[in-house]
From Swiss-Prot:
Protein name in the entry: Putative 3-methyladenine DNA glycosylase
GO molecular function, one term: DNA binding
Matching CDD domains: AAG
Entry's EC annotation: 3.2.2.-
Pfam family, one: Pur_DNA_glyco
Species assigned in the record: Rickettsia conorii (strain ATCC VR-613 / Malish 7)
């Protein structure tokens, strides 16, 4: 595998949709496990009705207001954790949800769905508000992988369904050939 080069804070401190698209093909490293990000969704500010910060700043959503480059982990349906990365400028609430990955170390495994990937990786509420910068156990790395993706409406929500802010890999042939990952 190519060497993981951690992305800097500036990578996350940009437009959320740009970050969401550029996370496709990046490597998520978490406590000895490495996965290629294959699906993301954007949640942007108080005018996005599906964004947790749509109703303002709360104890739960405080992390979304920055700075960028931190994890935002929360529980849904009382049983599944979701992993997000805080984006944009400090003071503006936004994050990218990581919806799918292809694990490449320690095994080859496709995980579709934010709950599945958090369960497999061992990410839970104790990993909320982790700084992803200068962190040897939890970070995003650039391995130079570019994967084709499509843009669709976000899924699993009831508000803001008109936003085409979901990004999902369309062809993993390159990923499979480089890393022998099975779909």
């Amino acid at each position: 595998m190519n060497k993981l080069i951690p992305v800097p804070r500036e990578f996350f401190a940009r437009d959320t949709n740009v970050v969401s698209t550029e996370l496709i093909g990046k490597a998520l490293y978490f406590q000895g496990k490495t996965a290629i990000i294959t699906e993301t969704e954007s949640y942007i500010g108080q005018n996005d009705p599906a964004c947790h910060a749509a109703r303002g700043r709360t104890k739960r959503t405080d992390i979304m207001f920055g700075p960028a480059g931190f994890s935002y982990v929360y529980l849904i349906y009382g049983m599944y954790y979701c992993l997000n990365f805080v984006t944009e400028a400090k003071g503006f609430p936004a994050a990218t949800l990581i919806r799918g990955v292809h694990v490449i170390l320690p095994e080859n495994l496709y995980l579709n769905g934010p709950g599945k990937l958090c369960k497999y990786l061992g990410i839970n509420i104790s990993h909320n508000k982790c700084d992803l910068i200068n962190n040897n156990e939890f970070f995003v790395g650039d391995i130079g992988l570019k994967l084709p993706y499509s843009t669709t409406a976000r899924i699993g929500i009831t508000k803001g369904t008109d936003k085409l802010w979901r990004y999902v890999v369309t062809d993993i042939t390159n990923l499979i050939s480089q890393y022998n990952v099975q779909p």
